[in-house]
Each structure stands twice: as C-alpha cells, then as structure tokens.
A protein has these predicted regions:
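Outer-membrane beta-barrel proteins and related beta-barrel translocases across Gram-negative bacteria
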Residues: 8-11, 15, 19-565
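Short, exposed "boundary/linker" segments that immediately precede the start
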Residues: 1-2
Length: 565
C-alpha cells in the first residue's frame, strides 16, 4: 500500500533491511537493504531493474547501479543480460564544474553470442568556457561495427543513425566596436559512417581543419557591412580533396519603419581551390568570383476584427524579393559540401539555392508573397497563419547539381496554412507546385485533436514527387476511466509497406500504472526490428521494465503521462 508513505513530506527518507515490495498483495521484489528518499535526493545504490524483450536480442534484464560520487560527479553502471547475445556492461559518467561539463558513455559486449565478436559503443561530450569570449567543445562517437545500433538499440532514434561525428571546436564571440560583432570558429571534424549493405553511401569529407570568420558592422553612415568567410582543408580516402577558401563580403542599406521595409544588398562571393592531384595528374588551382545583388521589401497592414466571440488583430504582409546572380560554369570545381536546399516559404527569400560553398546558383528571380496572421488582442498569441508565395524565374536556371540539366523560365508556387482552428484542433498544411509542368512537387497536411491531457488524435499526409508518399496516424485515447489505447503508424503508400508502428495499452490506477507497448521500426533497407515494452510504474517509488515513454513521445505527438498529477 503506497498511499501512506507517498502522502508524507517529500524529504522523508526510508532506510530498512529485508524489504519486500508487494503489488496487489503479491510479493515481486526482495531487497536485503533499502535506502532512498522521496525528495529526489541522489543516493548511491541499485536502481529498479529493467526487464524487456526484443526480436534481435531476446529477453533481457538490466540492473543499474547509481554511484553518487560527489555533488558534481556521478556514474551509472548497468549490467545488461540478453538471452540471445550475452552480458553487456553499460557505463555513464557525468561531471560539472563552474566553467565546464560533460558526459562519457561506454558500453561493451565482450563476446556476442551471435556474431562471436566484441561489440562496443562510446560517446563523449565536453563543453568548456575558457573566458574572454572563448569556448570549446569536444564530441566523439564510435561503435564497433555498422550493425551495432540495429542489433542492440531499442529506439529508431539510434537505429536510423548513419554518420557518427568525431569533432572538436574552439570558438570566439565578441564585439566589433559599437554595433558590431565578430565570431571566429575552429573545427576539426570527421565521421564514422555506418553502412547498410543494401544501400552503401559515400562517407563525408573530413575537415582538417575548418576556420570560420564572420563579422557584422551596423549603421556605418546608414550602411550595414557583413563578412562570411571560411578556409577548409577537406580530406577523403577515395575522392579528390584539397583546400578551399570562401569569402562573401556584402553591404546593405536597411530602410525600415513600423509599416514596411526595403533592403537593397550587394555582395561578391569569391572561392579559391587548391586541389590535391589524383594519381597520375598534376595539382589543380581554380577560382570563382560572382557578384550577388538582391532587394528585399515588405509592407505591414493591420486591422481589428471580432471573430468567434473574441477580439483579434488581422495582419496583411505583402513581400517582394529579387535576386540576381550571373551564370558561371562550375563543372570543373569539386563538390565538398553543397546540396540543394528544400524549397520552403522561408527559402524563397534566400539568395542561395544550394547549401555550402561549392555551387553558387545563377538567378534572375522575383518572389512575390503575402502572409496574413490572426493574433489574439488580449494575449498576443498567434491563432492562425496563412501564406502564399510565388518565385518567378525570369530566365532559365542553368546551374544544377546534376549537369547538364536546366530549368526553364517559369514559376514555383507555395502555400501554407497553420494554426489553432479551435481551442482543441491544430492544423498544419502546405503545398508546392511546379507551374511550368503543372506538377505537384510536395504536399504536407496534418491535423491534431487534443481536447484534454491523455486524449489526442493526429492524422498526417506527406508527399514528395518521385521520392515518397506517406500517411501518419497516431492516438492516445481513453477506453475506460483507467485504460488507454496507444497506437501510431507510419505507412508508405509509394512502397505499400509499414515503415514504423506502435501499439499498446496503458492502465492508470492513481498511484501506479502499467504500460504494455510493442514498437516496430525500420533499421535498414528491407530490415525491421520489434521491441516489446512492459513497465510497471509505482509513482514516486520505482518503475520496473523497459521505459516506453520516449518511444511513445516520438510516435504519438502530444502523448501525456496520465499518472503525473
């Protein structure tokens, strides 16, 4: 009976020996000695055991041991036995000082019963403030093999990982006189690439190192000056690599008041390459210099309206953006880090179509757009936002990542609608059209009904031409006063298969709850994994079993723990 101790003061400590924990008068846990606090203070000792079952590892049990080393240091050591794979040891160490902090995790399976190999995973994060504007960080991850997460992790957040970063940074941020700032960053970076045998990928370039310098200076005789620059040594075992210097100085004239703005801008993007020679050839040097001109402008109109028995402010925000960049053939340049950016409402007001520095798109384009928002007068909260935009190509696009493809003059159209239609219904929708070819490029549509905590229904649809077409449905719904249904599905209409699914029930009896959940997700091409979660949670005391909360929150947006008062 947990009611009596849980109603006592939160600082109450319990110390006892030969303790038997009973649930419904059934003894299920014997503790030769027990010492813990309801107030949440950290104490050294064993935590509640974790029980579970997965398709790839079999039945498993973990018994974490928590070591409260000092107020700013602690460690958790977790023996984890898996019936199909053997005994694994997990270790987590955390530390914090006034100017630094970090976390080290190291898991090892000395002799996997299936692969007959030692499996391990390590992750180290460290952040430090060095003073006078300087800071540094270290992030290192490595696993023993490409199947480590697919075989031993219980979450799609891990099994979907491909490139594990191994990097160190040092950065400086400071003022540049009055109304100015300066940011300098040093990055050394490489990755461990986890390969899927049925869909191998090329590993990213190493940056050994990358130096970045960005500076801004505002209101210099009415002008704003910006500088974006970086110098990078790219290294790769199989692809041509070398050095790249990128400079983009620009100057703009910001003219702005309460009802509108106009901002002309001119800049010059210069890139220099010093490339290493492939076998049997000479080293290569290349340069590219392109001017970039843009004009951004917009107006703001407002009016008071009465809707749904409430007072609102409705805005009308027309905006026009023009950009011009001349064409230059760039097939002779390497592509270290450029990729085409997703077409979105924010991106249509960008000068650049490609990320990175290796491809600078040609452009002679006008963007016309209008946004309207409905804002609650009393709170200032945005209730509904609607936006439409059209990017008009005055000349054909000649530069693409896939040469020699070109895009004719024409227009792209985008529309978005989002907001809280009623106090309990949220919606988010968008569509992108290629008006040249009368094709629908992308669609997203979603609606969420959330009338109260513990009661939510989400329905979503996503489409990208020639890439994917998917439906997402998820819910947390009460069946009775104490029982709740839990379900989610991510289904590919294009491939006619289930990509991820979750099904379970939750029972809440005020001071304890029980969760039974099955979670299936894709781990690799044509491979899936199923994890079964069984958790008994005794409120403020302990929980036994594999915790499914993270999987439920990922699979069911808006999921609420109903046993938290």
């Amino acid at each position: 009976d947990l009611h009596y101790p849980l109603r006592r003061q939160r600082q109450m400590c319990i110390r006892d020996s030969n303790v038997t924990v009973r649930f419904k008068d059934v003894p299920f846990l014997y503790l030769p000695w027990m010492n813990f606090s309801f107030g949440g203070q950290r104490k050294t000792g064993f935590l509640a055991p974790i029980l579970g079952n997965t398709a790839r590892s079999g039945a498993e049990v973990s018994v974490p041991f928590y070591w409260n080393i000092a107020p700013n240091y602690d460690a958790t050591i977790t023996p984890r036995y898996m019936s199909k794979r053997g005994l694994m040891l997990g270790n987590e160490f955390r530390y914090m000082e006034q100017t630094l902090g970090g976390q080290l995790m190291f898991d090892i399976l000395p002799d996997d019963l299936i692969t007959d190999e030692t499996r391990y995973g390590v992750a180290f994060n460290h952040n430090q403030w060095l003073g006078n504007g300087w800071g540094g960080s270290l992030h290192y991850e490595r696993v023993s093999d490409s199947n480590y997460f697919r075989d031993l992790a219980n979450s799609v957040a891990f099994t979907s990982r491909t490139n594990l970063p191994q990097q160190a940074t040092a950065s400086y941020f400071g003022a540049l006189g009055r109304d100015g700032s300066l940011n300098f960053n040093i990055l050394v970076q490489k990755f461990q690439t986890l390969q899927d045998p049925l869909a191998t990928i090329i590993s990213p370039f190493k940056r050994l190192p990358q130096l970045t310098l960005n500076a801004t200076k505002r209101n210099v005789y009415g002008l704003d000056f910006d500088l974006a620059s970086n110098w990078t040594h790219f290294s790769h075992p199989t692809l041509q690599d070398g050095f790249r210097l990128a400079l983009y100085p620009s100057v703009s004239i910001p003219l702005q008041n309460s009802w509108g703005f106009i901002k002309p801008r001119i800049g010059v993007h210069h890139t220099r390459y010093d490339l290493n020679a492939p076998t049997g050839t000479e080293a290569k040097t290349a340069n590219r210099t392109l001017p970039i001109l843009s004009l951004d402008s917009g107006l703001m109109f407002e009016r008071d309206v009465n809707l749904w028995q409430g007072k609102y402010v409705q805005t009308l925000e027309p905006r026009m953006f023009y950009v011009y960049i001349p064409f230059e053939q760039q097939n002779n340049l390497p592509n270290f880090d450029s990729a085409e950016m997703d077409f979105s409402f924010a991106q249509i007001f960008s000068e650049r179509r490609f990320s990175g520095e290796d491809r600078i798109n040609d452009a002679n384009e006008i963007t016309l757009a209008v946004t309207s928002r409905l804002i609650e007068s009393a709170t200032g909260n945005e209730r509904i936002r609607a936006a439409v935009g059209q990017k008009i190509r005055l000349t054909e696009r000649r530069l693409t990542l896939i040469s020699p493809q070109t895009t004719a003059a024409g227009a792209d159209f985008i529309a978005e609608l989002s907001g809280r239609i009623t106090p309990h219904i949220l919606t988010d929708a968008g569509v992108q059209l290629d008006q040249n070819n009368f094709l629908t490029e992308k669609i997203r549509a979603g609606i969420s009904y959330h009338p109260q905590p513990g009661k939510v229904l989400n329905i979503g649809y996503r489409f990208s031409r020639d890439v994917f077409e998917q439906v997402d449905i998820s819910t947390q719904w009460p069946l009775t006063k104490k029982w709740q249904a839990l379900a989610s599905t991510n289904y590919s209409l294009k491939d006619d298969k289930l990509l991820a699914g979750l099904l379970g029930v939750e029972y809440n009896a005020c001071c304890w709850s029980l969760r039974l959940v099955a979670n299936r997700f894709t781990t690799a091409t044509q491979k899936t994994s199923t994890t079964f979660f069984v958790q008994l949670e005794l409120n403020d005391l302990m929980s036994i079993g594999i915790n499914p909360i993270r999987a439920l929150q990922q699979g069911i947006p808006g999921y609420t723990r109903t046993n938290i008062q």
